[in-house]
Every structure is written in C-alpha cells, then in structure tokens.
Amino acid sequence: MAKVLYITAHPFNELVSNSMAAGKAFIETYQQHHPDDEVKHIDLFETYIPVIDKDVLTGWGKMSNGETLTDDEQMKVSRLSDILEEFLSADKYVFVTPMWNLSFPPVVKAYIDAISIAGKTFKYSAEGPQGLLTDKKVLHIQSRGGYYTEGPAADFEMGDRYLRTIMTFLGVPSYETIIIEGHNAEPHKTEEIKATSINNAEKLATTF
C-alpha cells in the first residue's frame, strides 16, 4: 500500500480552476485503480506553513545547542517538523498549481522550504549534495493561460522548472507533468484544452 500526498495550491476549486479540475480527475481515477492506497489532501491555502524567519533560524540554533526555545520559536519549529515528517511518510506526491507571475503561488515555495532539510531530504557529502528521496514519485499538474512549454515565452517559465529542479536535487527519480496551457491565449479552445487535460490526468492515474 502506498501513501499519496495530494498537494493543492489554488484558492478556487475545480469548478473555476483548470488545474484543480485535472487534479480532481486524477485523484478520483487513481483511487479507483489503487483502492488500497492512502490519499491525503493538503490544501496549502488552508494549511499553516511557517516561513523560515528569525524565530525558525534562532530556534534551530537553540535546539542544536540544547537551549530553551521561546513559545513562538517552539511553535514554528514544531510545525515545520510535522510538515516534514508527513512529507517523508509518503511515497508519491501530486502537486496542483496555477502559474502565477511566471511561477506558482508563494505557499508552494513555503512548503518546499519546509521539506528541503539537510539530513532529512538531502545530505552533504564529499561529492557534494545528495538527494535522499530516491524511492519517491512526483506529478505536477499546472495550468497556464498562455503558452510556455515552447516558443518565445518558454524561458520565462519558472514554476514547473523550479519544482522539477528541487525534486531532482532531493533525489526523486520519477517526475511527471500534466501541463494545461493556452486557454487565455485562445479562449475559443478553453473547453477543448480542459477536456484534454482531464483525459490525460485520468490516463496517467491508472499507472502512476
């Protein structure tokens, strides 16, 4: 039995969001074909994720030295530890994001910072950093109103590129994508683009 974290970063649901519609289709089909697997939904817009700030950095330093943390430091450090342990307990991750300002919503970066921890998801060695998530799988479902996979705007895309890069850095050997794009550039194709993405999501869910 595998554990899947379904990690969404959109303020709207599948009735409004193309990425959420594809994500919903993926998860429902996945559960039909993998009934014994556990699926946990993490809505990053409804989840408290401490940013790495002065309290966190000071708290980590105090922990290393065996010192007492303040209440704020303890609360933030403990919450980040819980997020990390939940992430480590899973086998597969499905990220659902829109493209915002060429990337993704800031809650995604906060979450990635929470799980990118030396000694847990990667380590330093004589050969350089080594990823430790060598038995995990990732799917990224992202919607983009324009076209960024190819063409003159391709170099501007920094959302999927960043997520792919950080997951490679963390050692993840399998990274797949479902990209939904062009519905704002060509509004007359919106329904066709959405239907294609849902179909692709349902197909991938059977083998992921």
Swiss-Prot record:
<dbReference type="GO" id="GO:0009055">
    <property type="term" value="F:electron transfer activity"/>
</dbReference>
<keyword id="KW-0288">FMN</keyword>
<feature type="binding site">
    <location>
        <begin position="143"/>
        <end position="146"/>
    </location>
    <ligand>
        <name>FMN</name>
    </ligand>
</feature>
<dbReference type="GO" id="GO:0016652">
    <property type="term" value="F:oxidoreductase activity, acting on NAD(P)H as acceptor"/>
</dbReference>
<dbReference type="InterPro" id="IPR029039">
    <property type="entry name" value="Flavoprotein-like_sf"/>
</dbReference>
<keyword id="KW-0285">Flavoprotein</keyword>
<dbReference type="InterPro" id="IPR003680">
    <property type="entry name" value="Flavodoxin_fold"/>
</dbReference>
<comment type="function">
    <text>Also exhibits azoreductase activity. Catalyzes the reductive cleavage of the azo bond in aromatic azo compounds to the corresponding amines.</text>
</comment>
<comment type="similarity">
    <text>Belongs to the azoreductase type 1 family.</text>
</comment>
<dbReference type="InterPro" id="IPR050104">
    <property type="entry name" value="FMN-dep_NADH:Q_OxRdtase_AzoR1"/>
</dbReference>
<keyword id="KW-0560">Oxidoreductase</keyword>
<feature type="binding site">
    <location>
        <begin position="17"/>
        <end position="19"/>
    </location>
    <ligand>
        <name>FMN</name>
    </ligand>
</feature>
<dbReference type="GO" id="GO:0016655">
    <property type="term" value="F:oxidoreductase activity, acting on NAD(P)H, quinone or similar compound as acceptor"/>
</dbReference>
<dbReference type="Pfam" id="PF02525">
    <property type="entry name" value="Flavodoxin_2"/>
</dbReference>
<comment type="function">
    <text>Quinone reductase that provides resistance to thiol-specific stress caused by electrophilic quinones.</text>
</comment>
<comment type="subunit">
    <text>Homodimer.</text>
</comment>
<feature type="binding site">
    <location>
        <begin position="99"/>
        <end position="102"/>
    </location>
    <ligand>
        <name>FMN</name>
    </ligand>
</feature>
<keyword id="KW-0520">NAD</keyword>
<dbReference type="GO" id="GO:0010181">
    <property type="term" value="F:FMN binding"/>
</dbReference>
<protein>
    <recommendedName>
        <fullName>FMN-dependent NADH:quinone oxidoreductase</fullName>
        <ecNumber>1.6.5.-</ecNumber>
        <ecNumber>1.7.1.17</ecNumber>
    </recommendedName>
</protein>
<dbReference type="InterPro" id="IPR023048">
    <property type="entry name" value="NADH:quinone_OxRdtase_FMN_depd"/>
</dbReference>
